[in-house]
A protein has these predicted regions:
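Patatin-like phospholipase
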Residues: 1-42, 50-158
Length: 158
């Protein structure tokens, strides 16, 4: 990799299956000898950023993503807060990366979600990676937000 005094930060957005486009960006950067010095992501971008920050190559992440079946990654629930639970997404993360903490990633990482009560941005830089990604992938009205933030408000990706 080329030595450069500048640090490349990369923010990866959401978009469900479109989130796999981020893998092409990561691969292209690698081909140019560039490696992000910081990663940030939300929703599908949070998943891609997390796997990369914990050492997976873009092609390996693509193979892992193929194993995620959204209908199996969610559980139906009967609640006025949402139709599905995304607990299985947390289990999916832990299956491939273990019960890791965000701060233990090899590349500094931030996972972005929103407080469903206020709409304010919530940035996770420490704590359980699986929990942060569950918050980041939670869509209001679709997923029941079982995660409660420090002030007891549920988290969401919107």
């Amino acid at each position: 990799m080329a030595e450069d005094p500048h640090i490349l930060g990369l923010a990866l957005g959401g978009g469900a299956f479109r989130g796999t486009a981020h893998l092409g960006v990561l691969k292209a950067l690698e081909e140019e000898g560039l490696r992000p010095g910081f990663l940030c992501g939300t929703s599908a971008g949070a998943m891609a950023a997390a796997f990369y920050a914990f050492g997976m190559a873009p092609e390996e992440i693509r193979n892992v993503a193929r194993n995620l079946r959204w209908l199996k990654a969610t559980n139906f629930t009967f609640s006025k807060l949402g139709l599905l639970s995304n607990n299985e997404i947390g289990k999916f993360i832990e299956k491939y990366l273990g019960e890791v903490l965000i701060e233990d990633s090899s590349i500094p990482l931030a996972i972005v979600a929103a407080d469903i009560s206020t709409g304010e941005k919530v940035v996770f830089k420490t704590g359980s990676l699986a929990t942060a990604i569950m918050a980041s992938t939670c869509i209001p009205g679709v997923f029941l937000s079982e995660l409660r933030l420090a002030d007891s408000h549920p988290a969401t990706d919107r």
